[in-house]
Structure formats: C-alpha cells, structure tokens
Amino acid sequence: MSNETQFEKLLSDVRETLDIEVKETLDIAGDPNHRAALAKEIIALANHGGGFVIIGYEEKEDGDFVPSVNRKPSMMDWSTDKVQSIISRYVDPHMQCSVTQTSIPNSEDRCVIIAVPGGHKVPVRAKSGSPDN
C-alpha cells in the first residue's frame, strides 16, 4: 500500500488506537514541553510496534475527531529535520521517523502525519525529560 493510500485511509476515519495517536496542535518550535510530549508519543508507538501521530485534529464530545480550528495556520514547523532533532534530544536509541504534510479530506487545510517505525531490538526510552520535569 502506498503512503498516499495509507494516509487517505487514516484520514477517512480519524480515531485513536494503540498504533494511532491524534493531537490537536503542538507548538514544537516554541514550547519545549510540547517537544517532549511529542517524543513521549513517539516512544510509546515505537515500543508498541510502530504507528502514526496525526497532528491537526481535535476530539469532539462524542469521541469523533474533526479538523482542529486551533492548529497553527502554518505547518512550517513540521519538517522531518525538526522532528528528527526532537528525537535526537529525547529518544534513545535514535530512530528515523517520516513526516508528511497532507491535505485534510474535503478541506483546503493540511495536517501532519508522523510515521513511527517499530520492531526495535531494544526498548525505546526517554533520553531526557521535559524542561518541567
């Protein structure tokens, strides 16, 4: 299955599962606690066997996810280099995640999908904590 097809499937029915984590927004450029929170999600997914972090959706009271109105208007912060620098700072052992910005179905808006690999030979752990810890 191509990445594009896989992303279309993920976004056709956004929900959290053991291998999918959904976040409304994270300020990874300006807030070190948000960078640490992203690293924590990546660690959990990596230890589970891999998965995806979807940025740009919020959970409604009924449990459904919809595109977030609070996400940053610019997705410029979400590059592979930026996410890899967070992984280098907080995650051990180092891993390579792919970061894709893609269109939200039936919308002109975009979201971010981070693909987290699984199958690590040793447990993935935090190299350092958030600044508040």
Protein language model regions, located:
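Conserved N-terminal catalytic/coupling substructures associated with nucleotide/phosphate chemistry
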Residues: 1-133
